[in-house]
Every structure is written in C-alpha cells, then in structure tokens.
C-alpha cells in the first residue's frame, strides 16, 4: 500500500485541494441534519419561533411581561426594543413583520444589536407564567389563543391599578413558585415560553408570515449548502479522476519504458502475457483504487469524526446504539474478509493464466487447426476460464452477502433510535427533529466505517497489483548502457567501418549450466560477407544476439572497430546495425511507415530503393494504395515471403554499417533469393554482412563461412576450403546440393 501512497504523493497539490473540497462537502453533510432538525422542531412544531424573544410585541403584552421581571431585567428589555420609526435600528425581520400587521397596533420592534441569548433567559420565566395564565383563562379542554392572552393582559393591567399593588410582592410570589417546582417540571415547561410568543404573533396576525419566513430562510440555506456540496463533490470527482488517470498514465509509461529496456532474459522471466496483464489490468486496478482513496478514504474519517462530534455536542443518551452498530459492522467485515482475502490474491494469478492461454491459442491458431487440436485447446481455455470464474463467484458471493447484513444492521440501528428516542420524546427530553438529526448522524458514522471497510476489501488486491508493477519497475535490465566514465572519449567522433570481431567468446543463457557458445573467435570484415551455418540449435542466432547486445557475453568480448560493445551506448551500437530477425515482424501502419521504422532520416527514395533491392517493389506496386497500403498488426495481411522481404527492406533502408540476417532468406523461393542477394551485394558495398543460414546455396559465395556445431566453431573458411577440410560442412552440403552443383570433379568431395 505504501507504493500507492508514494504515487499519490507526487500529486500532493491536487490531493490537498481534494481534501479541502472534502472538508467543504463534509461540512455540508454534517450541517444539513441540523437544518432538518430546525425545520421540524422550530419551523413546523414551533411555527417558526426559534426562542422566547418576540421580534414584534405589543406594548400591552410587553408591559405585563416586564411586571414579571426584576427591575434590572425590565430595564434591559426596554433597552432592547424600539418603536417603529424610532431612533433605534430595528431588526430587519422585525421591520418586515411590522408591515404585515393585521391592525395598527402600538408595537415594539427588537433592535438589531440586541443580545438574544441574554434576552431569552430574561423572557423565559415571564413567558411561561403568561402562557399558563392564558391557558387557565381559555378554560379546561380549550387551547389558549390570542383572545385568552388579551384577557390575561387586561387582567394584569387592571391589577396594577388596584390600591396596594406592589411589584415586589409579585416578584416574591413568582420566586416562591419557581422554588417549589422541581428541575424536571421547569424543563418540561420550557417549551411554553415559545408558545407564548406564538400567541402574541397570533394576536398580531403575523403567525403565518413568521413561520413561512423561517421555512423559506432555513430552506434557502439548505438549498445553497446543497448546491455547494454538489459543486464540491463534482470537483472532487473530477480532480480524483484526473489524478488517478495521471498516475495510471505514468505507471503505464514507466512499465513500457522498463519493458523496452529489458533484455530477452527479463522478458522470459516475466512472460509476455504477465507483462501485458501488469500493464493493463494491474494499472487499471491501481487507478480505480486511487479514485476510491481520494474520494472515500479521505472523506470517511472527516465524516465519521464530524458525526461523532455533533452527537457528543447533542449530549444524547442514545450514543450506545452507535457503538453497538459499529461493533456489529466491524465483526461482520472481519468474518467475511477471512474468507474473501485469500481468494483475492489467487484471482490475479488466474487472470495471468487466462491471458497466457488466450494468447497461446490466438497466436497459434493455424497449427491448432492443422493438427485438429481445437477441442484440446478449448478444454485448456475452459479450464483456465472455469478456475477464474469459480474464484470470482466465491468472492462476489461473499461481497453480495455483506450488503444484506449491513442493511439489517443499519435498519436495526434506526429502529433502536426510533424506539428509545420515542420514549424520550414522550418524556419531553427530546424533540422529533433532534431524533431525526441523531438518526442522520448515526447513519453518517456507520457509513464512514462502512466506506473504510469496503476500501479495506479492495486495498489488498490493489496492493498485489502495485507489487506486481513495482516488481517490473525495480527489475534492473541485465543489459544497460555503460557509465559515462567507461565510454571511450573519442566515441562520438569515431569513424565507423563496421568490423565485427569475436575474441574467444563464451556465452551461457541465464539459468543454464551449460555454454550455448564456447570459444568463438573470428573477425567479420567490412566489404565482406560472413556466413554462419550449422544444425538447428547449434547457437547461430545466439551469436547474432551477442552482436546486438540482446544478451551479454559471459566470457571474452565482442568488438566493433576495436570497441567493446559493452562500452558503447546501446543506441550507438544499434544505430550501426541493420537487423533482420529469423521471424519477420511488421507493425500496424502502412508499408511506408514500416520501411521507415529504422530511423527518422530515411527518405522516400531510400524506401523505394530498399524495396527494389529486397524484391518487394513488384507486389507493393500491385497494391492499389502502393506504399500507403495498410499493414495489420503483426503483418497478418501479407504472406510470409512478403513479410520477410519487407523486413529485409526495412534493414536496407537504414543504410547500416553492419547487416545481420538471421536466416532471413529461408522464406524466399530460390529465384527471389538469388535476385535479392545479387542486388544486396551491390548495395552493401563496404558494409559488413553477417548471414545466418540453413541453406548452402545462401552462403555458397560468402567470403567467410563459419560452421557451428554444439556452440563451437568446427570449420572456418570459404566454400571450397570447407569442402576439403570440414566434415560437418561436407555433410550439410551433400544433403542439399548435387555433385554438379558442388562443382566436384568426378562427383567426389
């Protein structure tokens, strides 16, 4: 996993922006339940009245309320209100409500600079007393209304006119009543203060306006917050996708560059199918994981911690339900992961296996049909496919079983909250909106743990993919450029002739205990053709691979113009070579693009000259599009001979100093072979030509012929010399040519 985070660290700026946006999104998610609670509790149940402080109040009602306050509190209330059009700056909402009064009452408006929290404490007890008095005036079984409030205020006003009335006596009676009431009774009466404000608004004819104003304002804030959350979520998704895509791009680029630098031994170590899987499937797995890490792993802790803080601030006694839900969820995930995790590790290997079988079948479809092995290969593919299917079915079933259980836990959690929360609502210690908010916070906390556990399921598989990719990226190629100090100082100014020399070379393939080549010693001179012939598996191709540095020698040295190839940059060495592999390889594109594959400086004239020398001009001209004719992937839309001639033309167009032909003429008929070699001899001029061949006719006129047997040179010389001195060469020659063709007198060797 640390490998994935290292890749993310390269995009730290974008990650910081994503975290900032996630904080904005989490703020919205955590604030919306509060607004929902306010809409239910305040906007609906309390008719939009948030506290015990009326924003608009009649003079008559305010005077009665002040009677029930201390002198200091009454003075504070007087200072907090102003008359319409007075010198004080009234609250904007109070001014708006004053314009909607049903009758021209004499009212006071709450000042904009009033301390509402302090006023709420001051108004609380007088509001409760006045509401209870209004309820008593309404009569048993009747809800108090504006008329009852008017009756009570009139009674209080009349009482103040009675002889012997004392405000201090009223305060003393009120204090005694409060002292006799228990704390629970006072808590239960706290909501009555808001109801008194509702009666006052009802008397003023603005109760509906107050409620609608509150709902519109709160709903507007919720809408604005929701839009902000949506914008943040969209930006998070965009940035996370871009970061993940950039990481995937860099990984694919890194894997490609590393694979291109691999020698044949590293390619054999990983296998082509595995390298393809690592470059595609594994990189895609990491890309998906990076998106999830940025969108979920970073978001889940923010949401969970924020939900816990809100629940703690609410001081609810239902927090044990959250602990129970999280514990059950973690237990469920732990049990399921014990079954699923081993299968996730196996799945990647099975994907490699399926890719390998598919590649073998598709590349070998012709031999499969020729030998009627379709059923056998179908059985092979079916076995690999079935193994992968069974593993995927098992993991999918485990993951599918997770969702019903998690749904059960979440629904059970909601049920417990409603059950125990309902009892608290009945007791008056919780409001409906608060319970709704608590359910929402609980779901957010549970979902945050759920997101983390879901990511925990994916991370091991992504970790395996990251390890597989890292294995490729950290594998050092066996063939690498020399350090600058080891490169000859005059190499860049060196005039290359192309003389290739093997100095007592030994070579052993990686992992093998026996030499593939032993004590190879010869010189291939410019302007001459050196041919290498021998039985299958004697080391002919291996010898060419040492010149190209596909492998390095294990003993001795290979030099070009006296410079050890290991002391030359690979680009310099291969810039001197025109290599035609044993199996012609073409790339998707056109004939022209394939022939110009050897370098950027190849002109159209070079292409046409090379095609003419390689005897490819005739069939190219016969195509409607000529040199712009398309070539399918792997050259599947041309014949074997045409593919080989195009491969030869590609090497010729480069005008190299050294030509390497690895049994390149075997796919050609004799007539084309002779014509091609005749034209090639005129073209190569002073270049060094090294030909690996199976046919004697191909090497008959070479200046130097090397006969290989079991990795050793058993003969060296011209055709005539070898016919006299090398039994191995004589055996090959007699098996292919008649005595007349061998130009032997009397039919004898």
Outline where the language-model segments fall.
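Alpha-helical transmembrane segments
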Residues: 25, 29-33, 224, 229, ...
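ABC-type nucleotide-binding domain
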Residues: 15, 51, 65-67, 87-88, ...
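An intracellular "coupling" helix at the cytosolic face of ABC transporter transmembrane type-1 domains
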Residues: 10, 166, 264-265, 281-290, ...
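Membrane-integrated ABC transporters
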Residues: 1-32, 36-223, 228, 232, ...
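Short intracellular "coupling" helices and adjacent cytoplasmic loop segments at the cytosolic face
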Residues: 44-51, 58-65, 153, 160-167, ...
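Juxtamembrane helix-loop junctions of ABC transporter transmembrane domains
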Residues: 28-44, 216, 225-268, 272, ...
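Helix-loop-helix
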Residues: 306, 310-327, 331-333, 337-338, ...
């Amino acid at each position: 996993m640390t490998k994935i985070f290292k890749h993310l660290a390269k995009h730290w700026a974008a990650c910081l922006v994503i975290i900032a946006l996630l904080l904005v999104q989490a703020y919205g998610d955590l604030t919306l339940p509060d607004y929902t609670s306010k809409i239910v509790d305040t906007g609906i149940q309390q008719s939009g009245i948030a506290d015990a402080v009326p924003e608009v109040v009649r003079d008559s009602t305010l005077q009665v309320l002040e009677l029930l306050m201390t002198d200091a509190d009454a003075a504070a209330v007087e200072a907090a209100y102003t008359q319409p059009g007075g010198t004080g700056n009234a609250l904007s909402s109070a001014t708006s409500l004053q314009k909607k009064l049903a009758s021209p009452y004499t009212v006071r408006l709450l000042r904009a600079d009033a301390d509402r929290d302090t006023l709420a404490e001051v108004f609380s007890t007088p509001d409760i007393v006045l509401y209870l008095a209004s309820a008593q005036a309404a009569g048993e079984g009747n809800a108090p209304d504006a008329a009852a409030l008017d009756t009570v205020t009139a009674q209080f006003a009349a009482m103040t006119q009675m002889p012997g009335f004392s405000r201090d006596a009223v305060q003393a009676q009120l204090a005694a009543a409060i002292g006799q009431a228990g704390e629970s009774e006072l808590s239960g009466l706290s909501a009555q203060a808001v109801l008194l404000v509702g009666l006052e608004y009802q008397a003023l004819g603005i109760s509906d306006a107050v409620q609608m104003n509150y709902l519109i304002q709160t709903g507007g804030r919720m809408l604005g917050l929701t839009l902000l959350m949506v914008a943040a979520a969209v930006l998070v998704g965009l940035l996370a996708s871009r970061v993940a895509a950039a990481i995937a791009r860099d990984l694919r680029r890194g894997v490609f560059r590393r694979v291109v630098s691999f020698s044949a031994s590293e390619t054999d170590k990983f296998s082509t199918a595995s390298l393809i899987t690592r470059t595609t499937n594994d990189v895609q797995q990491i890309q998906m994981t990076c998106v999830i890490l940025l969108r979920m792993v970073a978001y889940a802790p923010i949401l969970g911690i924020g939900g816990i803080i809100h629940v703690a601030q609410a001081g609810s006694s239902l927090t044990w339900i959250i602990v129970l839900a999280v514990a059950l969820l973690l237990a469920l995930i732990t049990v399921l992961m014990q079954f699923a995790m081993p299968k996730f590790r196996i799945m990647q290997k099975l994907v490699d296996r399926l890719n390998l079988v598919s590649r073998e079948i598709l590349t070998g479809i012709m031999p499969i049909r020729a030998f009627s092995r379709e059923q056998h290969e179908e059985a092979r593919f079916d076995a690999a496919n079935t193994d992968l299917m069974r593993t995927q079915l098992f993991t999918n079933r485990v993951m599918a079983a997770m969702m019903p259980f998690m749904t059960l836990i979440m629904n059970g959690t909601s049920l417990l909250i409603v059950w125990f929360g309902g009892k608290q609502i009945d007791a008056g210690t919780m409001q409906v909106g608060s319970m709704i908010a608590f359910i929402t916070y609980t779901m957010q906390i549970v979902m945050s743990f759920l997101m983390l556990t879901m990511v925990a399921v994916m991370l091991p598989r992504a970790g395996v993919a990251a390890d597989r990719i890292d294995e490729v990226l950290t594998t050092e190629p066996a063939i690498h450029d020399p350090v600058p100090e080891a490169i000859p100082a005059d190499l860049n100014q060196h005039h290359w002739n192309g003389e290739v020399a093997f100095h007592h070379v030994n070579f052993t393939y990686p992992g093998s205990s026996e030499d593939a080549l032993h004590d190879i010693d010869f010189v291939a001179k410019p302007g001459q053709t050196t041919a290498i012939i021998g039985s299958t598996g004697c080391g002919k191709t291996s010898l060419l691979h040492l010149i190209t540095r596909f492998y390095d020698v294990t003993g001795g040295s290979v030099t070009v113009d006296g410079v050890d190839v290991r002391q030359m940059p690979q680009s310099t060495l291969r810039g001197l070579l025109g290599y035609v592999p044993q199996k012609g390889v073409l790339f998707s594109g056109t004939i022209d693009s394939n022939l110009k594959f050897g370098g950027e400086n190849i002109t159209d004239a070079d292409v046409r000259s090379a095609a003419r020398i390689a005897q490819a001009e005739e069939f190219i001209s016969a195509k409607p599009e000529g040199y712009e004719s398309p070539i399918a992937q792997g050259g599947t839309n041309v014949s074997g001979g045409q593919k080989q001639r195009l491969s030869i033309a590609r090497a010729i167009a480069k005008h190299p100093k050294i030509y390497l032909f690895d049994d390149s003429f075997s796919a050609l008929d004799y007539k084309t072979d002779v014509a091609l070699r005749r034209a090639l001899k005129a073209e190569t001029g002073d270049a060094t030509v090294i030909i690996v061949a199976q046919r004697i006719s191909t090497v008959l006129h070479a200046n130097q012929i090397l006969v290989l047997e079991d990795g050793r040179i058993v003969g060296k010389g011209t055709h005539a010399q070898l016919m006299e001195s090398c039994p191995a060469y004589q055996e090959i020659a007699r098996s292919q040519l008649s005595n007349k063709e061998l130009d032997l007198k009397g039919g004898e060797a």
